[in-house]
Amino acid sequence: MIDKVRAFIHRHQLLSEGAAVIVGVSGGPDSLALLHVFLSLRDEWKLQVIAAHVDHMFRGRESEEEMEFVKRFCVERRILCETAQIDVPAFQRSAGLGAQEAARICRYRFFAELMEKHQAGYVAVGHHGDDQVETILMRLVRGSTSKGYAGIPVKRPFHGGYLIRPFLAVSRAEIEAYCRQMGLSPRCDPSNEKDDYTRNRFRHHIVPLLRQENPRLHERFQQYSEMMAEDEQFLEELAADALNKVMEKQHRDAALSIGPFLELPRPLQRRVLQLLLLRLYGGVPPTLTSVHIGHILMLCERGRPSGMIDLPKGLKVIRSYDRCLFTFDAESGEKGYWFELPVPALLPLPNGYAIISEFGEHYPRKQAGNDWFVVDPASVSLPLRVRTRRRGDRMVLKGTGGTKKLKEIFIEAKIPRMERDRWPIVEDADGRILWVPGLKKSAFEAQNRGQARYILLQYQAMNS
């Protein structure tokens, strides 16, 4: 088995000679065999091998015994061993995560700390060929992204180095045979024998049937995984270029231009969405599936100009005319604001703009457009106020004298619904709407009649 693993490491360039390697060791057959293999290769490749074990504190004394077992194993073989006891149940409750995801996050944080401490370039974990088969099958059945269908990667960047999986070349049966041959006595987790978990049901009932058809099943699935990963890498490069052409980044949010997006080939559309979501989630994708991607595509393609769908972890996708907004600001459309507008002042607004107010002795020469408004202090009730829209809002339009609903003004200007709820409206103390900045002026704007004093209002972006 060592020869097969050695060849796999060479073929995928998993390690460099003289490297420091953190080996994750739970005490089970896979990780114990992995540590033993690295021990066998240590002198040949001049490796510094550090064993890393985490007690997740799920099983009390039993977990502590596993930690002591790993320590003894390392002491007997003169392997540096780093251990940690982490209250994963407490972290799980505070973060609202599943047990396995919480344990994985805590474990990998510990690995990252050890990489810094020992200046290690690699973390090796014990996923094997059967894990690959189970993972791909589960994702095919449940639904996943194109990248997810490629299964477990052989090597990926991790904390300035790489996370590697040398055992993807071998099966569970080969690992168990290796343990017997080398006289290793790994600890066995009894939960692996129960059908309570989806992976266990695939392991006990589905994979054995497939292996009857092909005893080298894990090798076929690994070949499939590597081909899919290569295809995905190429398509991701195309998707990254396409994404830059159709996306507008807005702080934690992003907006997609629907027209240019729909001109892309369908395979690129899917991957552009996957890449966009990956960036929005901060590089840690949640449980996203092809179903979610399909829903976003339907939202972009359908004839209706508006709509909204919910994605995991509070992300919303909001269609408004020719834009699709991806936002975590789930409640922004429900929260209004109300500010008094002093003079002079610079009043920052929640939508990223500001209203600048000042006194002027002369009527401004340049106040064309809807980003300026001139107030005659004698003809309005002070103080001025800035607020968000309310049901039934109407204003008297400048030039016509007629009234119009603010809702109609927003619709005619094609302002997305999400932005309407944050759009500023300037009124006087009597509640008369004077100005919808950037969109419409009311009939209450001051005229150039030689008054001694005016209030000048300007609406501009905060970063301008």
UniProtKB/Swiss-Prot annotation:
EC class of the enzyme, as a word: ligase
Entry domain remark: The N-terminal region contains the highly conserved SGGXDS motif, predicted to be a P-loop motif involved in ATP binding.
The name this protein goes by in its record: tRNA(Ile)-lysidine synthase
Gene Ontology molecular functions: ATP binding; tRNA(Ile)-lysidine synthase activity
Stated family: Belongs to the tRNA(Ile)-lysidine synthase family.
Leader peptide range in chain numbering: none
NCBIfam families per the UniProt record, alphabetical: lysidine_TilS_C, lysidine_TilS_N
Record-linked SUPFAM superfamilies: Adenine nucleotide alpha hydrolases-like (SSF52402), MesJ substrate recognition domain-like (SSF82829), PheT/TilS domain (SSF56037)
Purpose of the protein: Ligates lysine onto the cytidine present at position 34 of the AUA codon-specific tRNA(Ile) that contains the anticodon CAU, in an ATP-dependent manner. Cytidine is converted to lysidine, thus changing the amino acid specificity of the tRNA from methionine to isoleucine.
EC numbers on record: 6.3.4.19
GO cellular component: cytoplasm
An annotated GO BP: tRNA modification
Subcellular location: Cytoplasm
Superkingdom to which the source organism belongs: Bacteria
Cystine residue pairs: none
Catalysed reactions, semicolon-separated: cytidine(34) in tRNA(Ile2) + L-lysine + ATP = lysidine(34) in tRNA(Ile2) + AMP + diphosphate + H(+)
Residues reported to bind ATP: 26-31
Keywords: ATP-binding, Cytoplasm, Ligase, Nucleotide-binding, tRNA processing
Stored Gene3D superfamilies: 3.30.465.60, HUPs, tRNA (Ile)-lysidine synthase
Alphabetical list of PANTHER family matching this protein: TRNA(ILE)-LYSIDINE SYNTHASE-RELATED
